[in-house]
Design a protein with these regions (language model features):
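Membrane-embedded alpha-helical bundles that constitute the cytochrome b-like, heme-associated redox core
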Residues: 1-219
Length: 219
């Protein structure tokens, strides 16, 4: 058994930056008023992070790539029966992979609907002028009510799952996302995590930020 780099620095920074942004969005959304300026800024930051993760899933570290997610029904069934191969549990296990995709998709939907929302008082998303009043009202209702509730519930479920794995399975999922490493058999491939790797991440982040800037300027 050896120490293997599973989660590279860019992946870990993305993860914790997203956590902080989501916490900030909940707080600023509940506070309202002048805090909504930061609510919008954090929303743009979330869109930038999601765009980065989309790109990083293609060019990032070995275990951060979309191709490494065990998403087939057969993988989930084998994991449920305790017969999953090692490479299906090094990064995200099959159930965790689907949970992560659902969380990212719902976060993207919530951030996207925020671009079109309008509280009809003082705050309007930059793309709200592009839609009719009926569509804006519908998307605003989703964003402020069901969408927010679903996202908070899914985040809570994610946290509970991490605690359950620690308590019942004895598997620490939190420390590897902090330090990046797991103790694994020597044959398990490691994720690259050096200066050139970080430069590639910076390019992906810059490209995502430029895309978000262009998007919010469409309104």
């Amino acid at each position: 058994m050896v120490t293997v780099r599973v989660w590279d620095v860019p992946t870990r920074l993305f993860h914790w930056a997203l956590v902080l942004c989501l916490l900030g969005l909940v707080l600023t959304g509940q506070t309202g008023g002048d805090a909504m300026v930061w609510h919008f800024r954090l929303g743009y930051a979330v869109l930038t992070l999601l765009g980065f993760r989309l790109l990083w899933g293609v060019v990032g570290g070995h275990w951060s790539r979309w191709s490494r997610l065990p998403l087939s029904p057969a993988s989930a069934w084998a994991y449920w029966r305790g017969r999953a191969p090692l490479h299906h549990t090094v990064g995200h296990n099959p159930l965790g992979a689907w949970s992560v995709l659902a969380l990212l998709a719902l976060t993207a939907l919530q951030a996207g609907t925020g671009l079109f929302s309008d509280d009809e008082i003082a705050n309007a998303g930059p793309l709200s002028p592009l839609l009719t009043g009926a569509w804006v009202s519908a998307l605003t209702a989703w964003h402020k009510n069901l969408g927010k509730a679903l996202l908070i519930a899914l985040v809570a479920l994610h946290v509970l799952a991490i605690a359950w794995y620690r308590w019942r399975q004895g598997e620490d999922l939190l420390t590897p996302m902090l330090r990046g490493d797991k103790v694994l058999p020597a044959e398990v491939p490691a994720s690259r995590d050096g200066a050139w790797h970080w430069l590639r991440a910076a390019v992906c982040l810059a490209a995502s930020a430029a895309a978000v800037r262009w998007l919010i300027g469409l309104g």
